[in-house]
Amino acid sequence: MSTRRQAITLYRNLLRESEKLPSYNFRMYAARKIRDTFRANRSTRDFAEIDRQMAEGQQNLELIRRQVIIGHLYSADKLVIENKKTLKPSDD
């Protein structure tokens, strides 16, 4: 598998796992951090640096997976912004 394909696969896996985080704030932070980090390192050409970043990304993927499990064990109430119900307009 090429390095580019590995990076894209890692990127997608990180985003998918971050979507599973139970807390809205953590989900949004993780997705933003993943996108920003990959964009910032898009132009890296040094293979040693790419390998280091890929290893760091794999560690972060495992970290997110653990946090998802912990988050589901100790879940809290959802925030108002997370409610999927739409409010009906009042008849005032």
Curated annotation (Swiss-Prot):
One of its GO terms (cellular component) is mitochondrial matrix. Component of the mitochondrial core iron-sulfur cluster (ISC) assembly complex at least composed of the cysteine desulfurase Nfs1, the scaffold protein IscU, the accessory protein bcn92/Isd11/Lyrm4, and probably fh/frataxin. Interacts with Nfs1. It is found in: Mitochondrion. The gene is bcn92. One of its GO terms (molecular function) is structural molecule activity. This is LYR motif-containing protein 4 homolog. It comes from Drosophila melanogaster. Belongs to the complex I LYR family. Residues 48-68 form a coiled coil. GO terms for biological process: [2Fe-2S] cluster assembly; iron-sulfur cluster assembly. Disruption phenotype: RNAi-mediated knockdown does not affect circadian rhythms. InterPro entries: Complex1_LYR_dom, Complex1_LYR_LYRM4, ISC_assembly_LYR. It holds the Pfam family Complex1_LYR. Its main location: mitochondrion. Keywords: Coiled coil, Mitochondrion. Stabilizing factor of the core iron-sulfur cluster (ISC) assembly complex that regulates the stability and cysteine desulfurase activity of Nfs1 and participates in the [2Fe-2S] clusters assembly on the scaffolding protein IscU.
